Amino acid sequence: MSVISMKQLLEAGVHFGHQTRRWNPKMAEYIFTERNGIYIIDLQKTVKKVEEAYYFLREVAMNGQGVLFVGTKKQAQDSIREEAQRADQYYVNARWLGGMLTNFKTIKGRINRLKELTKMEEEGVFDVLPKKEVTKLRAEKEKLEKYLGGIKEMKELPGALFVVDPRKERIAVLEARRLGIPVVAIVDTNCDPDEVDYVIPGNDDAIRAVKLIASKMADAIIEGRQGEQLSVESTAQEQVEETAQEETAVEA
């Protein structure tokens, strides 16, 4: 059974590309035709590419690595947050801060500051501080939460990135490439597919299209994490059985 159907892709409008004057010739192999000045994406290729990305992210999750969802354009923000949270993963949906990957040590310092402010608020420290200072601290906390809230539990670099519109998220893609982190992305007809390891040709501007593909990537991660859990449980069971066999052998 395929990961995604042509019907699902059509209903979500994944096949609508950009205007023909706004295109990247490198995307030619993924274009089916042109209609009323708009490129139509070949959904047969999209089905295949979604499957490739699905199995890759499932493998990443099975290996116990995290996946960072990135989509800061308005149409992607909610889906990126919702699907990353559903898969218990990390996300950036407000703005990519330069160095989020390549200077992760510094970013971790800002995350620690966010956690410190959150703890202060929870423990009632804000209640005893001067009002002016509390206003300033709350503003700092809100800003950090907006930009770093989705990665505050990310203790190490992710095993992969899932990106909506690599053209807009170019800095994130470049940082990942520099560090050798594979990139899975929804790539529209105006993007450069060469910058992406797992290209999913599709409409990156329609909310339903982004939601559909992001949800499939989240499904892959959830499936992979269940596989990782089963693998850990299986190994533990084998160790218990081996110990029991050794004890039996010693007694004999």
Swiss-Prot record:
UniProt keyword Cell division present: no
GO MF entries: structural constituent of ribosome
GO biological process, one term: translation
Pfam family, one: Ribosomal_S2
SUPFAM superfamilies found in the cross-reference section: Ribosomal protein S2
Region (Disordered), start-end ranges: 231-252
GO CC terms: cytosolic small ribosomal subunit
Domain of life: Bacteria
Gene3D superfamilies linked: Glucose-6-phosphate isomerase like protein, domain 1 (3.40.50.10490), Helix hairpin bin (1.10.287.610)
Acidic residues compositional bias, start-end: 239-252
Protein keywords: Ribonucleoprotein, Ribosomal protein
Family in the record: Belongs to the universal ribosomal protein uS2 family.
The protein's name in its UniProt record: Small ribosomal subunit protein uS2
Record organism: Acetivibrio thermocellus (strain ATCC 27405 / DSM 1237 / JCM 9322 / NBRC 103400 / NCIMB 10682 / NRRL B-4536 / VPI 7372)
Gene behind this protein: rpsB
